[in-house]
Amino acid sequence: MTLVISNTVAAILEKSSNPLIISEIDLPSDLSNGQVLVEVITSGLCGAQINEIEAVKGPDKFLPHLLGHEGFANVLQIGPGVTNVAPGDQVVMHWRPGIGIQSLPPVYKYKGVPLNAGWVTTFNNHAIVSENRITKISSANHDKNIIPLLGCALTTALGVLKNDAQIIPSDSLLIFGIGGVGLLLIKIAKILGIKSITVVDIYKEKLDKAIELGASKTILFTDKNQTNHSLLEYFGTKFPTVVIDTTGNTLAIEICYEISAPNARVILVGVPKHGKKVSIYTLPLHFGKVLKGSEGGHSKPEKDIPYLLKLIETNTLYLNDYPTQSFSINKINDAIAQLKSGVVGRMIIDFTKSS
């Protein structure tokens, strides 16, 4: 099927640790089996993209490439075999595979040469995505700054608590890192009946927001010894049974492991920089303690997105107090700088903004 458009604007990672390049890119001439053309309305900016830009996992073999993995979009065209969405549908864009075909990745061009992209990218005004990376939602009057979070931040927070940690109301929760996901962990933990929620961060403004959203106790991280001392003083002998690190900071991970209960589930959401190592004493793992990395909370978009959307629509999950800040695609590097500086909440790229 011939595409209705031939080019679009995108933010491109051309060189690691450098600002993104805003430029027009060329789309392929048609859609292949399982591909869907969407017009992106808004996209969330996730810590994972900061990691990509800074090559946290090691040298980037795919440069130049597109970025972004949580978005809100309109379907424009569908390729052969697509049955779960139709032109005119509104969809959440997500990186976790859902239902439908997993297509080949699209082949864009930038300056006449191939531009790499995965099954979903959201920092481009128009995107060709795999059918199983989008989930249809009702065409209601949605908050365009919140809906993208269903593609990663919200579904990850839910999945980390329910799937990875298998949290229950009698658990006590400790969270390191109160960024976009950390704040939502507080929100969802409250819905799941968790009464004791302790949070640690290096920014006082984030800790203040955490209290506003329902945290029981906040601790300002300055160094490992001080933080350990503050946590020991607060918990005494009743260590938390679920501990989640969203930072990827190796010192934070060590504290999470050391300060947790003997039968605790310690879940790692953040990823340490390539080459950084954590030192732990493994004996507790033989006697009930669990330490594991999370892959997006093992969320299932086709199930979790409708569930979370219903909670939002009924105000069970109240997000009017969840901080977001929107930027045009031309200002995406400003959004990245804000996120890296520790500004509270989620940075949103809004393709309906002209400047």
Predicted regions and their residues:
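C-terminal hydrophobic helical "lid"/dimerization subdomain
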Residues: 1-6, 254-258, 302-355
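Glycine-rich beta-strand-centered segment in the early N-terminal region that forms part
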Residues: 28-43, 56-100, 138-140
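Cysteine-cluster motifs in flexible loop/terminal segments that predominantly coordinate metals
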Residues: 46, 94-133, 144
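Mid-domain Rossmann-like dinucleotide-binding core that forms the NAD(H)/NADP(H) cofactor-binding site
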Residues: 139-223
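Glycine-rich phosphate-binding loop and adjacent beta-alpha segment
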Residues: 194, 250-316, 351-355
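Short amphipathic alpha-helix with an adjacent loop that forms part of the alpha/beta core around
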Residues: 224-237
